[in-house]
Regions:
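N-terminal intrinsically disordered, cationic/polar leader segments
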Residues: 2-190
Length: 190
């Protein structure tokens, strides 16, 4: 059996899980509600406060989907009870971030867009279910992405980081707070 897939998921008291026909699972908690449709071959059972996933056969596909289903269910339960967050740091001279309403404006040293038009800032709008917090006065400037959907939080953080990934020579750019940049030595003079 899959080592991940066979582990039961403990459902907290303030979280309710409903399993509908077609393996549609809805998890409701204090932070919100998540709904996901899972592979119909997996058998998802709620017994008391434990959620278990079993697979029909030991075929390779069933084994891989078994662990995936359990991990996604666990992410849903943790998301609606505790939530997820990712912190990004902006490092560089003149690099700034400001929150205006539901939009975060990033000034990351770009003077031109890829099509040659002038570009001073990137505007990122908060999607549904995600909150962006900017600590403008902190050194380095930090942006915290929060939400109940782990995949959406990670995707939004990756989009922000992708606007100016950190470079290895000076370390300038947008990086995750726990990310270590492998630094390179510059040119050696004659």
């Amino acid at each position: 059996m899959s080592r991940i897939g066979r582990m039961p998921i403990t459902v907290p008291a303030n979280v309710t899980v409903t399993i509908a026909d077609g393996n549609v699972v809805t998890v409701k908690g204090p932070l919100g509600t998540l709904t996901e449709k899972f592979n119909s071959r997996m058998m998802i059972k709620l017994e008391g406060n434990e959620l278990t996933v079993t697979r029909p056969t030991d075929e390779k596909e069933d084994r891989s989907v078994h662990g995936l289903t359990r991990a996604l269910l666990n992410n849903m339960v943790v998301g609606v009870s505790q939530g997820y967050s990712k912190t990004l740091e902006i490092i560089g001279v003149g690099y700034k971030a400001a929150k205006v309403g539901k939009t975060v404006e990033l000034y990351l040293g770009h003077s031109l867009m890829s099509n040659g038009k002038p570009q001073e800032k990137f505007c990122i709008v908060e999607p549904e279910g995600i909150t962006l917090e900017v600590a403008e006065k902190a050194v380095p400037i930090t942006i915290t992405v929060k939400g109940i959907d782990k995949q959406a939080v990670g995707q939004m953080a990756a989009v922000i980081r992708g606007k100016r990934p950190p470079e290895p020579y000076h370390g300038k750019g947008v990086k995750y707070a726990d990310e270590r940049i492998r630094r390179k030595a510059g040119k050696t003079g004659k």
